[in-house]
């Protein structure tokens, strides 16, 4: 849409909820946000991070750091040793514990790379090389 038109939506919150899911060329999140912000005439693009297997989502207010609700915790683990959990600032695979999933599996090991930050925040750096494309809209095929 923003490739063909420009908008003045400066009083609007624009939420990005994921990548191209293999349907178009994948863009780096920062580049996508820059294109969307310019095209929609807004200062920041907000983001949502979640998946079908979880009941909770994390949100970013446009600075690239996702915040979790109190019942959701994100961990990073070493990419070569799944038993080694990493500290803040270190890049690793994201693992999520969502206590809202109390009647199902509350622990998810993703194929997303990320980094932990203070105050229960994290950033998503991309997907692990050669990982499956994810996204519930791909189930239609």
Task: Annotate each PLM feature.
Residues 1-141:
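Active-site glycine/GP-rich loop and adjacent strand/helix microenvironment
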